[in-house]
Swiss-Prot record:
This is Cysteine and glycine-rich protein 2. Residues 94-110 have a biased composition (Polar residues). It is found in: Nucleus. A motif (Nuclear localization signal) lies at residues 64-69. It comes from Coturnix japonica (Japanese quail). Transmembrane segments: none annotated. Residues 10-61, 120-171 form the LIM zinc-binding domain. The gene is CSRP2. SUPFAM superfamilies: Glucocorticoid receptor-like (DNA-binding domain). Gene3D superfamilies: Cysteine Rich Protein (2.10.110.10). GO terms for cellular component: nucleus; Z disc.
Amino acid sequence: MPNWGGGNKCGACGRTVYHAEEVQCDGRSFHRCCFLCMVCRKNLDSTTVAIHDAEVYCKSCYGKKYGPKGYGYGQGAGTLNMDRGERLGIKPESSPSPHRPTTNPNTSKFAQKFGGAEKCSRCGDSVYAAEKVIGAGKPWHKNCFRCAKCGKSLESTTLTEKEGEIYCKGCYAKNFGPKGFGYGQGAGALVHAQ
């Protein structure tokens, strides 16, 4: 007997999933809005899902719950924290002295080799290779690589730097260039500064 208008059942909520809202994973169907990590409830897709015993997790929560435990394992220096996994049902090991993260600020070679990331000079968030621009010798997100005054998008050849901030050449000249008669933005904007 044909199934007129029906669909598969959602692996999370059990209701009917119609084709337009269906996400398939591990032979099961889910509503897009139900395809969430079992722990943190983040939305998942084919690049972020990890499956264990018919349960779906984001890769981060899966690694915390089922990944290798101990010193030296983890997700890279950019995501270290002191969470020991109690909320995931992991019982902490009793040890006389817990491991402490390093305080050595020189992590660039480690970060390049093991997947950590440098920090953006504007917003302070991690900058990964796909979004990294180098300007004034420092890393920036492509979206943060803008003039600090006017917000104009910059290129490494069109920027000027002062005290750790980057500016377009026009804003740099207006704000930090020479002042007085004969200096400025051209004959139409001459001023006399005292």
